Amino acid sequence: MKKIITIIFVSSILFTACKSNKTDSAATTIEQNMDEIKSSTAEQGKAGKGKITLQCNGKTYEINGVCGAVTSMGSLTIAVPDDSFPAKTFMINFTNDKMPSTTSSYTIIKSKLDDKDANHVTLSYADMRSTSTMIWESDDKTGKLDFVVNGNEIKCSFSNLTLQASEFYNKGELNAKATISGDLTIYKN
């Protein structure tokens, strides 16, 4: 779970480091942003398990690991870092900081910083190995994501959702659409 919080913490730094503050020095602004991120980051619920399979041009990539959730800067992220290589991570990002409390369906969209629709989520699959970084992300045509809530347990199963390759990172045959399938279980508490 600490790995998930670290990944979210680093991501939050990237999003807030460019925050405009013309009255302070750059060092003071960065310090203020770091304090804001630290104070707003919290683990949510109890960790479960996740298994994700991504297929691109006949190659299969898998993530098996702990499924956990954190809130930071007003948004919730459910993440599954791989047990054997934590920089290989699947993430679901919500536009609010609330875990699904009842069985719910969300529209998957392309990441938009100004989106505040509580029914929207974004998906990403990232493999940040230094030799061949690969990233795939959802777009506005990816589809729907359903969460089934049964008491304390929250489950999400999906199959054959299409993700778009990052043109910057994915090279050669990996610079193509991919399909992703998975099963996640997380607990409210």
Identify the function of each model-found stretch.
Residues 2-8:
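Sec-dependent signal peptide recognition
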Residues 14-17:
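C-terminal motif of bacterial Sec signal peptides marking the signal peptidase cleavage site
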Residues 19-22:
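Bacterial signal peptide processing site
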Residues 27-52:
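Post-signal peptide N-terminal segment of mature Sec-exported envelope proteins
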Residues 48-69:
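N-terminal small/polar-rich segments of proteins
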Residues 69-151, 164:
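Surface-exposed helix/loop patches within compact recognition domains
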Residues 148-189:
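C-terminal or internal capping secondary-structure element at the end of a domain, subdomain, or sheet
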